[in-house]
Amino acid sequence: MKLFGTSGIRMKNLTPEIAYKVGFAVSQIAKNVVVGRDTRTTGDLIRNSLFAGLLNGGAEIVDIGIVPTPTLGYSARNYDMGIMITASHNPSEYNGIKLFNKDGTSFRPEQEQNIEDIIYNKKNQKRVSWNSIKKVWTDESALKKYSDFILDSVEINKNFSVVVDCANSAGCVASPYLFTDVGAHVISVNGHIDGRFIGRSPEPNEKNLQDTMHMIKGLNENNKGNKYIGIAHDGDADRMIAIDEKGRLTDFDKLLAVFSRYMAEKTGTKTIITTVDASMAIEEYLKDLNVNVIRTKVGDVAVSDELNKHDDAIFGGEPSGTWIHKDIHLTPDGILSGLRLLEMMEFYDKKLYELIDDVPCYSNLREKLPCPDDKKIIVMDFVIKNGENIFDAEVETIDGARFSLDDGWVLIRPSGTEPFVRVRVEAKNDIIAKELLEKGIKLVKDGLNEKK
């Protein structure tokens, strides 16, 4: 696809022309649309162009303003579909457009392809006359409806101390308030709206969260009362990463394992959904519960689709900080996930670091290798054809090529948005991990040299 990547449209300097075309294409399939946006400086520009396209095709619009993506996803249930203007964790010069179904799930690739077909093939294009233009309504109650819904979905009786870092983005309008509403003592960091993300870059990783991590460590050094933990969001608060009482950023894979165990023990579910790039620690950590871990393609769309295939599956996540709680709603929700983290700590009566440190730790290595887009198919065909002999393991082609060994695994998959092929390995020790990575890199390079 020309416009849509693995998570909607995201690009540097997204133009009003593209926003108009997307809006017009959407108007051909939906006549009642709810729209939200994050705090980026180009948000109004993109919104107005999107609105022009929607109106030109006869759609009615409900604007809910600056909201987290999970608020938009929750609100979509009352309309034909939802549109979120956001570039998620990307820097401030980026913006994007993400489309949502009524059930809160993101558009699937075939739905996005249909939008592109309308744009580029001028398929089913119909403009309305001047006297059929619909209205743009404003719903200032959407955020409160979402907040009330989330508060009704969690039960937290213990008093916690939480530092909430919203990256000056959409989470600012909801996350600190909801943590306060459940009785937590909250310190808000980067908690005012600023589309330049002046406090930190919106991707919640170790580099960008250094100040918040040091703050939590300092707060707890001489604190004999409740120890602070940290909750950090990306640019639209559909993701969440936690910082433990020692000021350490929690590993995404370990957090996924802990969440999965909590949901299994609390609800009795025997099915957990995750992606092909998640750690084997999750199977190890859940082994005594006889939980079936089902792996799917990378991306929240694939996780939510797989959740819907299994009635007993109520939780899924991926090691990017994306957590989906099907028993509540199907949109990835960083705020709900942060609150459920408090629920989990209360359930086990343990500190966060105690829960995280209980998860097995394996050696992880990764590398990304330059690969022109027109060579990706050739390279992956070569990897799939030759990888089983190289690794002495059967290949799984759910998403890229994954080789599972007794003491580790290798995942080789092409980037959906960049001219790279990524190699990720995990093993029970550093020596095995290094050997697997070297084999994976050589396999990709040999594929690049393959002539067809």
UniProtKB/Swiss-Prot annotation:
SUPFAM superfamilies: Phosphoglucomutase, C-terminal domain, Phosphoglucomutase, first 3 domains. InterPro entries: A-D-PHexomutase_a/b/a-I, A-D-PHexomutase_a/b/a-I/II/III, A-D-PHexomutase_a/b/a-II, A-D-PHexomutase_a/b/a-III, A-D-PHexomutase_C, A-D-PHexomutase_C_sf, A-D-PHexomutase_CS, Alpha-D-phosphohexomutase_SF. Catalyzes the conversion of glucosamine-6-phosphate to glucosamine-1-phosphate. Its EC number is 5.4.2.10. Belongs to the phosphohexose mutase family. PANTHER family: PHOSPHOMANNOMUTASE. The lineage of its organism: Archaea, Methanobacteriati, Methanobacteriota, Methanomada group, Methanococci. Keywords: Isomerase, Magnesium, Metal-binding, Phosphoprotein. Activated by phosphorylation. One of its GO terms (biological process) is carbohydrate metabolic process. This is Phosphoglucosamine mutase. Mg(2+) binds at residues 88, 234, 236, 238. The modification Phosphoserine is found at residue 88. Its cofactor is Mg(2+). Binds 1 Mg(2+) ion per subunit. It catalyses: alpha-D-glucosamine 1-phosphate = D-glucosamine 6-phosphate. The gene is glmM. It comes from Methanococcus aeolicus (strain ATCC BAA-1280 / DSM 17508 / OCM 812 / Nankai-3). The active site is at 88 (phosphoserine intermediate). HAMAP family: GlmM_A (MF_01554_A). One of its GO terms (molecular function) is magnesium ion binding.
